[in-house]
Design a protein with these regions (language model features):
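Short amphipathic alpha-helix that is part of the acyltransferase structural core
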Residues: 1-39, 45, 51-54, 58, ...
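Conserved donor-binding loop and adjoining core beta-sheet/short helix segment
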Residues: 10-13, 20-118, 227-228, 232-249, ...
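Polar/charged side chains located within well-ordered beta-strands of beta-rich proteins
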Residues: 20, 49, 97, 140, ...
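Conserved acetyl-CoA-binding loop-helix of GNAT-fold acetyltransferases
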Residues: 89-102, 253, 259-272, 295, ...
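Extended hydrophobic/aromatic segments used for targeting, binding, or gating
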Residues: 233-251, 259-269, 273-283
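Active-site/acyl-donor-binding loops of N-acyltransferases
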Residues: 129-149, 222, 272, 277-317
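Acyl-donor-binding surface of acyltransferase catalytic domains
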Residues: 69, 85-175, 309-313
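A mid-sequence, solvent-exposed acidic-amphipathic segment
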Residues: 197-230, 235
Length: 317
């Protein structure tokens, strides 16, 4: 029968997780992949995954197109594609891409996009097929031992204007579950300015709740929010990213409250929490368009340790 591309099936999870771990540069096991897929809502977002298999039906690579829940656009599809290193340069990736391109055509997709590291097989593969870099993300890391902490002067600068800093946990304790939706709305509003591949749209409330409240990695007592009276105006969200490592999800301030030191105070409050709880590092990611955030991170001693490009292919033209 030879090599062929077929729909992804239940028996493919182990091989898929192994190949995806290599292709995506992060450890993925079959159980995690199943759990992630179980949370996908096919009634709201389209997704297709295929695998290339050998004569014995063993996966050699995979491909996926999907609508991104955090950047909903019915004509924009995000792509994932990976081939087992032992099977590369045999036309397998090309066969997978041909199948994905056909499926994109059926859906009348206008844009295909993905992230790719520099000088990788993936980058070479996609640029040969017309994908163009349109944005770039920078990974930044701060050692907690020497990280700046809140100062009386900074606290006074912010609080003297009526701004108060608290946490998601404290707000929830004080106001109950009804307090969660306004914080989610703030998170959604701040994301609108975070340029990347496509226009940001609100993360579904259930996903935000899992990420920041109920998940094992969630840290509601390190999720800092700024309030002007009863109005939520700034946020810096954090999750566990390892035994002693944290990851900032988003730091943002509503437009009318910027350039007042709020984002800086939120960030150094995170530093103080991390230091008090024995964390060694904080990781974050920022796109090149977010010049103000890059400048803030630079002033707080976050070096850029890696970067990768965001690529798009315009379809149908």
């Amino acid at each position: 029968m030879g090599r062929r591309v077929r729909p992804f099936a239940e028996q493919d999870y182990t091989a898929y997780a192994r190949i995806a771990s290599i292709a995506q540069g992060e450890r993925i096991n079959a159980a995690e992949a199943r759990a992630t897929d179980a949370r996908w809502d096919p009634t709201r977002y389209d997704r297709l995954r295929v695998v290339a298999v050998d004569e014995e039906d063993a996966p050699l690579g995979y491909g996926e197109i999907r609508q991104e829940p955090s950047r909903v656009d019915p004509r924009r599809y995000f792509i994932r594609l990976g081939v087992d290193p032992a099977s590369r340069r045999r036309g397998i990736g090309a066969a997978i891409w041909e199948r994905l391109a056909t499926e994109l055509g059926k859906r009348r997709a206008e844009v295909a996009c993905l992230w790719a590291f520099d000088a990788t097989a993936c980058q070479t593969f996609i640029t040969k097929r017309g994908f163009v870099e349109v944005t770039r993300t920078y990974a930044q890391v701060r050692a907690i031992a020497s990280a700046p902490l809140p100062t009386p002067a900074l606290e006074e600068r912010v609080t003297s204007t009526g701004i108060q800093i608290t946490t998601l946990a404290a707000v929830r304790d004080a106001l109950g579950e009804d307090a969660l939706e306004p914080v989610w709305e703030l998170h959604s509003a701040c994301r609108l300015d975070h340029a990347a591949l496509g226009r940001a749209t609100p993360q579904p409330f259930a996903e935000w709740l899992s990420d920041n409240v109920t998940d094992a990695a969630a840290l509601p007592d390190a999720y800092f929010v700024a309030l002007d009276g009863a109005r939520y105006v700034g946020v810096s969200s954090v999750r566990r990213d390892g035994e002693d490592t944290l990851r900032i999800g988003i730091t943002g301030v509503l437009p009318g409250y910027r350039r007042r030191g709020i984002a800086r105070l939120l960030t150094v409050r995170v530093h103080a929490w991390a230091k008090a709880h024995g964390s060694s590092e904080i990781h974050t990611e920022t796109t090149k368009e977010s010049t103000a955030m890059l400048a803030l991170n630079d002033s707080l001693g976050y070096p850029i340790v890696a970067s990768w490009g965001g690529y798009e292919l315009r379809l149908g033209g």
